Amino acid sequence: LIVEPLVLGAGGMLMYPASVLAELKKITEASGSLLIADEVMTGWGRTGTMFACEQASISPDILCTSKGLTGGTIPLAVTLVTDAIFRAHYSEDRKKTFFHSSSYTANPIACAAALANVEIWRDEPVAGRITALSVMQAVGLQRFRDNPYF
């Protein structure tokens, strides 16, 4: 099952609660299928946590991320998988190699930008700043709460 966690960007920015994402994870586990989270748009703090899946307290089997990985400076994409999936595909034998490539991987400049971004997330209070901004925005939006045109 492939999902955009919490925000269906391709569907016109439709939001759904974290409880739905948690239930989807239960369904995939019960059916023996994989949950693939497309966090290209939702990752790197855009939903309030580093990854939207965190809000449902779930770990997808496969997580795809891009855009925010480099702080939006240069294209780079990454696909993260569980250890079990990686081990099932990894081999020194070229016939069983874990092929992982695309047009947005391995650019040294993009990788340097991503590393700098990861260091910022590690060393600076980015999550705290996101929380503070979220609270400030929520307070500011309260005046529109009862406005039927907003």
Identify the residue ranges that each predicted region occupies.
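Conserved N-terminal phosphate-binding loop of PLP-dependent enzymes in the Aspartate aminotransferase
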Residues: I2-F150
